[in-house]
Amino acid sequence: MINEIRKDTEVRMEKCLEVFQNHISKIRTGRASPSILDGIQVEYYGTATPLRQLANIVVEDSRTLALTVFDRSLSAAVEKAIMTSDLGLNPSSAGTVIRVPLPALTEERRKDLIKVVRAEAEQGRVSIRNVRRDANEKVKALLKDKEISEDEDRRSQDDIQKLTDAFIKKVDAALAAKETELMDF
């Protein structure tokens, strides 16, 4: 029973870490990355469709993304979707290819993005701690029902705390890497 709780806790903490890493990967750093455009939806036959499903996105150089739209009739809709997104990008169409130049980040914008990343990291830590709390409550319930001894309870809580510390270290490492990436010129 305790092993099941531990495995479930580890899986849930891993998901919290994945969500955090996914969120910070979408924060623009000044370097071109196709993941920047992940959140963009394009109106396609009356349905909002992810841009990735409608175009091939490649990094042309460190500051430019190139999109090759599969259906040429969608080029205008793709450009409009990129322009109206909150990313502050201005695509330009050159025949079959849409180029998206990424403007350099100002110092002020970099600091704002670091604040956002730190807030995301704190949210990730809170999520991991909530998973720890849930796991500890399950262990306490087992102790209360006399299914485990107090020694097993203490050992389980120590294991859960070690897991929590390990995942919070991973969040902190990802945060430090993203901050470094944002401050690189």
Curated annotation (Swiss-Prot):
GO terms for cellular component: cytosol. One of its GO terms (biological process) is cytoplasmic translational termination. This is Ribosome-recycling factor. It comes from the Bacteria. Signal peptide: none annotated. Keywords: Cytoplasm, Protein biosynthesis. Responsible for the release of ribosomes from messenger RNA at the termination of protein biosynthesis. May increase the efficiency of translation by recycling ribosomes from one round of translation to another. GO terms for molecular function: ribosomal large subunit binding. CDD domains: RRF. Belongs to the RRF family. InterPro entries: Ribosome_recyc_fac, Ribosome_recyc_fac_dom, RRF_sf. It comes from Yersinia enterocolitica serotype O:8 / biotype 1B (strain NCTC 13174 / 8081). The keyword Cytoplasm applies. It is found in: Cytoplasm. It holds the Pfam family RRF.
